[in-house]
Amino acid sequence: MKRRTAREKALQSLFQIDVSDIEPNEAMQHALDGQESDAFFEQLVYGVLENKEKIDEMIKRHLVNWKLDRLANVDRAILRLSAYEMIFLDDIPVNVSMNEAIELAKQFGDDKSAKFVNGVLSNIKSDLE
C-alpha cells in the first residue's frame, strides 16, 4: 500500500472513531474495505490514538479563535494525523507530512480546509524547530 493510500485509510478510520466512537479495529476494517492492512497504516491509526492527548494539546496551542471540539470532524482528524507524523515519526520530513495533510484537506475537507490545516501545521512546525 502506498503511503498516501495508508494516510487516506488512516484518516477515514480516525474520522469514524471520532464521529461514531466505534472500536479502532472495526473502523480500520471498514476503511480497508477488503484490502490488505499495512504496517504504516496501522502505525498511523494506533499512534494517533495512543498519543491523542499530547497531539491534541499541541494542536490546541496553535488554534486561533477556535476550540478543538468545534473544528470540522475531518479537519480535526487531518490535524491529528499530520501532527502525529510531525511529532513522533522522525523518518518522515515535516514538509512531507504537511503537504500530505494539505492534499487530504483538499480531497476530504471543504474549500477552506487546506488553508486552515496549512496554517495550524505551519505553527506546529515552528514550535518543533
From Swiss-Prot:
- GO cellular component terms given for this protein: cytosol
Alphabetically sorted, this entry's keywords are: RNA-binding, Transcription, Transcription antitermination, Transcription regulation
What CDD domains does the record tag this protein with?
Terminator_NusB (cd00619)
What superkingdom does the record give? Bacteria
| Pfam families recorded | NusB
Q: Does the keyword Transcription apply?
A: yes
Q: Which GO terms describe its molecular function?
A: RNA binding
Biological process according to GO: DNA-templated transcription termination; transcription antitermination
**Entry function:** Involved in transcription antitermination. Required for transcription of ribosomal RNA (rRNA) genes. Binds specifically to the boxA antiterminator sequence of the ribosomal RNA (rrn) operons.
Q: Which PANTHER family match?
A: ANTITERMINATION NUSB DOMAIN-CONTAINING PROTEIN (PTHR11078:SF3), N UTILIZATION SUBSTANCE PROTEIN B-RELATED (PTHR11078)
The entry's family comment says: Belongs to the NusB family.
The name on file for this protein is Transcription antitermination protein NusB
Q: Which organism is it from?
A: Bacillus licheniformis (strain ATCC 14580 / DSM 13 / JCM 2505 / CCUG 7422 / NBRC 12200 / NCIMB 9375 / NCTC 10341 / NRRL NRS-1264 / Gibson 46)
